[in-house]
């Protein structure tokens, strides 16, 4: 089964993309079937200067498990933001300090203080390079490198939705939110521009070893 292209990122466009020495291009592919609960991905680090045989339209597989495994082509406009760990990755003492600090702001949004911190302050929704995983559907789990045991870091988050749960849309991008999509895209959903769906609306995190990016990566759905 041919794998599908999912993302192509250039180091010149994405400051947080820490490419291995001698490379400046990351290509992410996946199999459009669950292995066992999400698509299995493959990472390719390359030098853009050596990529000469470019396909205008990548071939589609003869079959897919779900339509949500075929991404809609998108042109990226990366925006750099600052994130913080999910409250579940913090000490009990720091969680309590954040809870007390967030009470007034959370009340204005009619949200629980911990939910306010996670949704509005700590974790940006949508597709992203780097950052922290969100643990709203499962508890934090260790992510050691299978080769050397180093704690792995998130390389790429593939998300079902681009928008968060807060009504104020604190993570909305800079571009004009009222911009109209192309009339050719009558099925376009601004909350899901890639049309990708992970599970019932989750995220798929791809993590790599910071000591040796060539070590096998791991996948996690949250």
Q: What do the PLM-derived regions correspond to, one by one?
A:
Residues 1-222:
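Preference for intrinsically disordered or flexible, low-complexity segments
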């Amino acid at each position: 089964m041919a794998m599908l292209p999912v993302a192509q990122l250039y180091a010149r466009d994405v400051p947080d993309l820490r490419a291995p020495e001698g490379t400046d291009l990351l290509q992410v592919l996946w199999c459009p079937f669950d292995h066992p609960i999400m698509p299995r991905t493959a990472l390719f680090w390359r030098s853009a200067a050596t990529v000469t045989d470019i396909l205008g339209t990548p071939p589609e597989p003869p079959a897919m498990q779900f339509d949500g495994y075929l991404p809609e082509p998108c042109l990226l406009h990366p925006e750099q933001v600052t994130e913080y760990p999910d409250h579940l990755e913090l000490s009990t003492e720091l969680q309590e300090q954040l809870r007390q600090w967030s009470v007034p702001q959370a009340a204005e949004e009619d949200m629980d203080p911990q939910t306010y911190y996670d949704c509005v302050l700590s974790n940006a929704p949508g597709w992203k390079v780097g950052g922290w995983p969100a643990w709203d559907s499962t508890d934090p789990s260790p992510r050691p490198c299978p080769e050397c045991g180093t704690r792995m870091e998130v390389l790429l988050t593939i998300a079902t939705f681009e928008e968060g749960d807060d009504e104020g849309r604190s993570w909305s991008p800079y571009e004009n939110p009222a911009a109209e999509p192309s009339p050719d895209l009558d099925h376009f959903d601004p909350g899901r521009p890639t049309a990708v769906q992970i599970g019932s609306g989750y995220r798929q995190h791809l993590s790599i070893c910071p000591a040796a990016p060539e070590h096998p990566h791991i996948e996690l759905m949250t």
